[in-house]
Amino acid sequence: MRSSRHGRSNERSIMKAVFLVGIVLVVSFLIFFNIGKLSSTAAERVRDVSQSAVQQQDKRPFTQPAQQKQSDGKPKGKVVYLTFDDGPSSLTGQFLDVLQEYNVKATFFMQGSNLKNTGYQDNVKRAVEEGHYVGAHSMTHDAIKLYDNKQFVPEMLETLHLIRNITGTNPKLTRPPYGSAPGLKEEQIRDQIADAGIKIWDWTIDSYDWKLKDNPNKIVENVKEQTTEDLEVVLMHEKPQTLQVLPEIIEFYKEKGYEFAVYRDEEHFRLNFQKDNRL
């Protein structure tokens, strides 16, 4: 009888041990499963945060690295500024596409009457977001109003205000329609410009693209013939013929070893036909 009772006691002990081992295994599995799940969740959260940070960074306006300067404030080396007047237009987005494809930044001078067109404003915002500069080209592009009637400063301030409202930037640079010569030859109007804190930029190369609708190759020829200095500022317009040859113009400057630059208010240098250092 003792042997039988002793055997049954051993069986119960073994069963208890097996049961306890089973519980330990189940608990261990649950612990490791939850730890793995928590680790996976944490990793996903880290990945989501990282992706969000990258997306936010992508939305920040492009910042051009500061360039080395000469004593007159102009950049050193072979530098070209591509500039486009008379936008925004139905072509602005396509110009931005080409510039994006070539990773080139440009400077746009936009007209107030066009900026008021809400259908164009998304591309104005896009231009700034992608690192381009948007300056003013007056409200009316009317030489009599701007120069004879002395409305240059009021129109430019109004245009700059529109740009600020659309993009959130605070540009100071303007381009006088038809250039500062002869438009700004009177010192009185230049005094008004200086007092208003407005800056002026003309150009070093005139592509004459606006009158070459049926001869786009001549635009490229004009640009090539006039490219003679290390620093060049090319005047172009938002025209179909210009869009057509823009890749060729970009390739030309790349082959010549030019760096593409975009205007920055804090790095302004004098570039006006009147040679007025205040502007």
Q: Locations of the language-model features?
A:
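Terminal accessory/targeting
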Residues: 1-81, 97-106, 230-279
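Catalytic domains of cell-wall/extracellular-matrix polysaccharide-remodeling enzymes
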Residues: 141-254, 258-259, 265-266, 273-278
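Active-site beta->alpha N-cap acidic-glycine motif
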Residues: 53-147, 151-165
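Detector for Asparagine
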Residues: 10, 34, 39, 48, ...
